[in-house]
UniProtKB/Swiss-Prot annotation:
Subunit structure and binding partners: Monomer.
Topology class, membrane: Multi-pass membrane protein
Pfam families in the cross-refs: MFS_1
Gene of this entry: mdfA
Protein name (record): Multidrug transporter MdfA
Amino acid sequence: MQTSFSPATRLGRRALLFPLCLVLFEFAAYIANDMIQPGMLAVVAEFNASVEWVPTSMTAYLAGGMFLQWLLGPLSDRRGRRPVMLAGVAFFVVTCLAILLVNSIEQFIAMRFLQGIGLCFIGAVGYATIQESFEEAVCIKITALMANVALIAPLLGPLAGAALIHVAPWQTMFVLFAVLGAISFAGLWRAMPETASLKGEKLSVANMWRDYKQVLANRRFLCGSLALGFASLPLLAWIAQSPVILISGEQLSTFEYGILQVPIFGALIIGNLTLARLSGKTSIPQLIRYGAGPMIVGLMIAAGSTLYSSHAYLWMTAGLSLYAFGIGLANAGLVRLTLFASDISKGTVSAAMGMISMMIFTLGIELAKVAYLWGDSRGFNLFNLMSGLLWLGLVMVFIRRQPEAVATE
């Protein structure tokens, strides 16, 4: 049964309530990763495990974020966005409380995987609903502004985690994540609209396979989805590996480690604010081009400085900050163009985008760990530069294949 929903053309107070509730859950899910990373050294010490488990916590979390996306997009298309999203938020709250019962590093990592499943619902269900609820110019502004709120997590997470671990056990963090998730659940219950276009239709494996096959056969969609993954990989690799690089490698304190996150994620927020200001005045492809220069130059600075001296962590931070500004400027527009590169229902398209990105993140973070173990910060930053160059090549192909109407709007 086809259903229709008229996208909002402006941001009233009522229209904003849903994205604010969604971004609170996104914040909880992200800070559940970023805040625990500086505390992972305490976790591995409690379980008598090696520091090699530190980035594995994030790998498991992102692997969980890939696990069910293939199902949740089509499921929410046919069963409704609201019930699927609410079930995901509730599951996240339960798993955050369940981790308090673990007694080994293996159990901890397994529970991190289950918590990561909450990420599936943000992309495959939540953001699909956002894209369907608002017209393009409004949607890009919302996406950019939501990204700023969500990015408070990696900005404040390392600082808050480093501070909290000195005064309370790491388990306290997961109680906080559960409380944030519960508040988000209450808000989404009240405010989330139902935008599913195929609600009431039968969910079948054959139909799912047909839809995914059609989406993945779209070369422009593939270029955009792969580009989105490689764009964010250096940032996520930094979040995962920076406790080892800065605290274990450079012998910095947890407070100094947290301070060095501020310019990187502050630049990311500035990039998103710049995007919100330019949106509607500049074409989306041009915004992506504006972001490309800072991204590649920043990654080159980070790689070049550490090739000169493996302890040049301040220059590395400066380079990653410039890169972060570029990704803040380019990413939201690329998400929008990629999502609408296919005519298949947006739950399925969003799920496919999420699976491709999460696969790149999961494998890439482990490869970044290997690069660091093999070549210290030199290998790590060369890996990030390779990721940025792959993004650049894919984006060039993506923009070249775009419809004429998009190129000139």
